[in-house]
Amino acid sequence: MDWLKNTTIVVLFSHSTDKSNKHKKRQVQCNMRKNTLDMVTIGIACLVGVYTGTRFFEPIVIDRLRKDGNLRTDIPIPEYDEDGNLLKVTPSLSSTPAAPPTPPTPPTPPQQ
């Protein structure tokens, strides 16, 4: 008779979890939506942060490269005023594109 009581308890317990499983499914779906929204929000915030960070540090980096003598001269470099505002992009004479290299001529086959 003891095994019957235990079986009944198990059946009643498993029956009561069916209702809670539906609730848990809804809760998991809600958590997944919340997690997805959080990840998208963090991604957008990171993109905005990187964009504004590069816009902020670009004049500082260009100035430092110019002082060190490591600034490339083959590309146009934007000019900034003392406040870091973009003045004008002026292409320098050395930034004119060079002629593309000519392809090597194929070797002539030996005549027989």
From Swiss-Prot:
Keyword Cell wall biogenesis/degradation: yes
Compositional bias ranges of the Pro residues kind: 98-112
Gene responsible for this protein: ECM19
Protein's organism: Saccharomyces cerevisiae (strain ATCC 204508 / S288c)
Tagged with keyword Repressor: no
Miscellaneous comment: Present with 1890 molecules/cell in log phase SD medium.
Keywords annotated in UniProt: Cell wall biogenesis/degradation, Membrane, Mitochondrion, Transmembrane, Transmembrane helix
Cellular component GO terms, alphabetical: mitochondrial membrane; mitochondrion
Descriptive protein name: Protein ECM19
Biological process annotations from GO: cell wall organization
Organism classification: Eukaryota, Fungi, Dikarya, Ascomycota, Saccharomycotina
Functional description taken from the UniProt entry: May be involved in cell wall organization and biogenesis.
Lineage top rank: taxon: Eukaryota
